[in-house]
Amino acid sequence: MQSNSASTGFANLLNPETASQNQQQQQQQPTSTPTASMAAATVSLMAPLLQNAPQQTEEPRQDLPRPYKCPLCDKAFHRLEHQTRHIRTHTGEKPHACTFPGCTKRFSRSDELTRHSRIHNNPNSRRGKGQQHAAATQAAVAAVQAGLMEPGSNLAHMMPPPSKPISRSAPGSQLGSPNVSPPHSFSNYSPGMSNDLAAYHQGGLSNSSSPSGLARPMDLLADAASRLEQRPGHISHSSRHHLTSGYHPYANRLPGLSQYAYSSQPMSRSHSHEDDDPYSHRMTKKSRPGSPSSTAPPSPTFSHDSCSPTPDHTPLATPAHSPRLRPHGFSDLQLPHLRHLSLNQNFVPALAPMEPSTEREQPYVPSQSSGLRIGDIISKPEGAQRKLPVPQVPKVAVQDLLNGPSNSGFSSGNNSATASLAGEDLSNRN
């Protein structure tokens, strides 16, 4: 033992740094051992407390009354909203609908709707990205076809950002797995629309890394909608196709609703080629004003052989003839006679506003006026002549007013006078 201690002392003299480190380690060991023992003791004491804690909270919870019982099963609940939520599991009621455009899902609980809405609000979520993409595309196309919005305007809030490139071994024509696309695809509305929208999906997959990846899918969607408009399956006449390609001011995009507000139904009822194309027959029945099936400009060839003209009170249909225009307020209209007009006069009489008249209006009959007019009096150069004439009152005697015949125009005064006399007579008798 002495030799070992002497050797260690000699080593400490040669290496003083290692000697100081050994002393520090020896001092730390006794201090660390009590801290470890204290931690183990606290964990051993906390373990039974943690195990007993939920038991203490559950015992009074089970003792609470459950007044709300399910009428369909034996379960009872503490709160009414819990019972209502449970009954929906039996009835299948789903009152909470998703408000995202294009999404038709409904839920029986509000927390399920909140969890589902995170899929739409978070564009980076992997779950449901394909369904979100297809639903937004379907909603945008439906809005364009219904005429509610133009294809190139504000589609960013309707469409999610394009997905990342997907590596797959399937052919390029298949855009994804069958369960990603919605069950109600676009083929039930128009044949071949998926081919037009294929460019939009491919553009969204290929241009996602570029900064213009959001703008390009919008342009592709607008082009697909314009190609759908010019498809011969939706155009039931050759002249309509000619006008669409030549006269149409919007060659690369769909027109707005305001462009054809009064001419959205170009074909008359008696001359339509609905029997030539079954798709046009189906779409003309369900089309609305401004829809793609009826946005072509009106053509005179559609109604030239129409026997029954379109009524004037339907402004959305183009009639076979020009509407009959008559002055709107013809009672105040005073036109000079033709003989009083000359070519040297620069005065042009102002006409009343012209509007299409209905069939119930009577034809215009100018009223014969006698005497001077206010315009003639004001236009006289002399100031003394600019006076209104004294109104001419028919000279009738008082006896004629009281005892005149009933057809003289004073029957009402006669009746009132006789009534007043009778009243005075009765008052005198009393």
Curated annotation (Swiss-Prot):
<comment type="similarity">
    <text>Belongs to the creA/MIG C2H2-type zinc-finger protein family.</text>
</comment>
<feature type="region of interest" description="Disordered">
    <location>
        <begin position="152"/>
        <end position="190"/>
    </location>
</feature>
<feature type="compositionally biased region" description="Polar residues">
    <location>
        <begin position="1"/>
        <end position="20"/>
    </location>
</feature>
<keyword id="KW-0678">Repressor</keyword>
<dbReference type="InterPro" id="IPR051007">
    <property type="entry name" value="creA/MIG_C2H2-ZnF"/>
</dbReference>
<keyword id="KW-0238">DNA-binding</keyword>
<dbReference type="InterPro" id="IPR013087">
    <property type="entry name" value="Znf_C2H2_type"/>
</dbReference>
<feature type="compositionally biased region" description="Basic and acidic residues">
    <location>
        <begin position="271"/>
        <end position="280"/>
    </location>
</feature>
<dbReference type="GO" id="GO:0000978">
    <property type="term" value="F:RNA polymerase II cis-regulatory region sequence-specific DNA binding"/>
</dbReference>
<feature type="region of interest" description="Disordered">
    <location>
        <begin position="231"/>
        <end position="250"/>
    </location>
</feature>
<dbReference type="Pfam" id="PF00096">
    <property type="entry name" value="zf-C2H2"/>
</dbReference>
<feature type="compositionally biased region" description="Polar residues">
    <location>
        <begin position="301"/>
        <end position="311"/>
    </location>
</feature>
<keyword id="KW-0863">Zinc-finger</keyword>
<feature type="region of interest" description="Disordered">
    <location>
        <begin position="1"/>
        <end position="67"/>
    </location>
</feature>
<dbReference type="GO" id="GO:0000433">
    <property type="term" value="P:carbon catabolite repression of transcription from RNA polymerase II promoter by glucose"/>
</dbReference>
<keyword id="KW-0479">Metal-binding</keyword>
<feature type="compositionally biased region" description="Polar residues">
    <location>
        <begin position="170"/>
        <end position="190"/>
    </location>
</feature>
<comment type="function">
    <text>Involved in carbon catabolite repression. Represses the transcription of a number of genes by binding to a GC-rich region in their promoter.</text>
</comment>
<dbReference type="InterPro" id="IPR036236">
    <property type="entry name" value="Znf_C2H2_sf"/>
</dbReference>
<feature type="region of interest" description="Disordered">
    <location>
        <begin position="353"/>
        <end position="430"/>
    </location>
</feature>
<dbReference type="GO" id="GO:0005634">
    <property type="term" value="C:nucleus"/>
</dbReference>
<keyword id="KW-0539">Nucleus</keyword>
<keyword id="KW-0862">Zinc</keyword>
<dbReference type="GO" id="GO:0005737">
    <property type="term" value="C:cytoplasm"/>
</dbReference>
<feature type="zinc finger region" description="C2H2-type 2">
    <location>
        <begin position="96"/>
        <end position="120"/>
    </location>
</feature>
<dbReference type="GO" id="GO:0008270">
    <property type="term" value="F:zinc ion binding"/>
</dbReference>
<feature type="region of interest" description="Disordered">
    <location>
        <begin position="262"/>
        <end position="331"/>
    </location>
</feature>
<feature type="zinc finger region" description="C2H2-type 1">
    <location>
        <begin position="68"/>
        <end position="90"/>
    </location>
</feature>
<keyword id="KW-0805">Transcription regulation</keyword>
<protein>
    <recommendedName>
        <fullName>DNA-binding protein creA</fullName>
    </recommendedName>
</protein>
<keyword id="KW-0677">Repeat</keyword>
<feature type="region of interest" description="Disordered">
    <location>
        <begin position="109"/>
        <end position="140"/>
    </location>
</feature>
<feature type="compositionally biased region" description="Low complexity">
    <location>
        <begin position="21"/>
        <end position="42"/>
    </location>
</feature>
<feature type="compositionally biased region" description="Low complexity">
    <location>
        <begin position="131"/>
        <end position="140"/>
    </location>
</feature>
<keyword id="KW-0804">Transcription</keyword>
<feature type="compositionally biased region" description="Low complexity">
    <location>
        <begin position="403"/>
        <end position="416"/>
    </location>
</feature>
